[in-house]
Amino acid sequence: MASKFKSPLHEMVSTTPTDLWNDSCSIHELTYAIEHGAVGATSNPTIVYNVLQQELGLWEDRIHQLIEENPNWSEVEITWKIFEEIGLKGAELLLPVFEREAGKKGRLSIQTNPANYRNAEAVAKQAVYFDSLAPNIQVKAPVTQAGIKAI
């Protein structure tokens, strides 16, 4: 007998009060997760690095375009721009969930640069910028003295 559920994940979110968050902003993984009931996703530098390893073909042209358009940018600036764009793509995929749930679900969690863990001003500036990118982005900041001050 065929199951009415698409997967064990779909069964879990359909039969329990569990909210499923995808621990990746990979386009392929997140698309699958949303189709099976996920209501959120997270990103951070390590996750985005793994996404690039898995989905480089989806991002390689954009990386080259950014380098070409911004010849004076450092590797760090290019990296953070790609980090931002991958996070934005995840937020875009989750936007229908965000709208359906009136903002209570459907969020993409994006992390500020952990290298700024001692710099409250830099954490706050990046957090405000990330928050401006999409209505369903929530920002993670380091729980350090500077991070708490930034919050």
Regions found by a protein language model. Name each.
Residues 38, 47-50, 55-150:
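Active-site beta->alpha loop and helix N-cap motifs at the rims of alpha/beta catalytic domains
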Residues 1-25:
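N- or domain-start disorder-to-order transition segments that initiate the globular core
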Residues 7, 24-29, 33, 95:
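Short alpha-helical segments and helix-capping/turn motifs at coil-helix boundaries
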Residues 10, 30, 151:
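Short glycine-/small-residue-rich flexible loop motifs, especially phosphate/cofactor-binding loops
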